[in-house]
């Protein structure tokens, strides 16, 4: 090195390596309404019901810095939005109270309809029960259909190219390659069924 070792300053290093940035502005509009009340009763107590609806719109805008070299991250400008409409109902139904087989027994029900602008419509639900044979012991069980919808970046992120690396455990090396990341508006929500059981013991 004819210039010597360790003589480069930060300004020269920034010029050679390159520095890029992406300024992102996020905005969310939410309109929601809900109501709850009792629609009747069983011999164990009143039946409670809750209704809700919501509309959300997420808007994002990204402005990249210019002139960055490809290996420093070539960010692209983007401007997009994604909206969601939801409607839900929940109910709590008492089935027994002060009985010989149960100090209390309750059934909970819930359903939700969600319509995503890009991912389409999905339905989720939950059925649960809480049984207390005695006041100090409660058994709980829940069965539900759950989802995870793609987020804004996964759907609409602008193209971002740059140098990537991956570790190869067979050769113990980390080769580098040129790659590109971008959003995919055709992604669908992930779905899963969940079953849970548990108990709560509170000695008096």
Where in this protein do the model-derived segments appear?
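Surface-exposed, low-complexity loop segments enriched in small/polar and acidic residues
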Residues: 1-85, 98-100, 144-189
């Amino acid at each position: 090195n004819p210039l010597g070792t360790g003589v480069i300053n930060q300004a020269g290093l920034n010029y050679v390596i390159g520095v890029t940035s992406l300024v992102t502005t996020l905005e969310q509009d939410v309109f929601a309404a809900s109501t709850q009340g009792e629609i009747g009763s069983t011999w164990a107590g009143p039946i409670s019901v809750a209704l809700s609806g919501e509309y959300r719109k997420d808007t994002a805008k990204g402005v990249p810095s210019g002139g960055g070299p490809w290996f420093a991250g070539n960010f692209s400008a983007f401007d997009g939005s994604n909206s969601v409409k939801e409607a839900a109902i929940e109910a709590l139904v008492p089935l027994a109270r002060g009985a010989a087989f149960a100090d209390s027994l309750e059934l909970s029900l819930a359903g939700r309809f969600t319509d995503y602008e890009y991912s389409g419509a999905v339905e989720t639900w939950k059925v649960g029960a809480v049984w207390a044979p005695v006041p100090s012991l409660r058994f709980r069980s829940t069965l539900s259909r759950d989802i995870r919808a793609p987020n804004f970046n996964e759907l609409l992120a602008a193209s971002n190219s740059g140098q990537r690396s991956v570790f190869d455990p067979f050769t113990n090396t980390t080769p580098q390659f040129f790659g590109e990341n971008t959003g995919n508006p055709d992604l669908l929500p992930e779905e899963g069924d969940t079953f849970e059981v548990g108990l709560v013991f509170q000695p008096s």
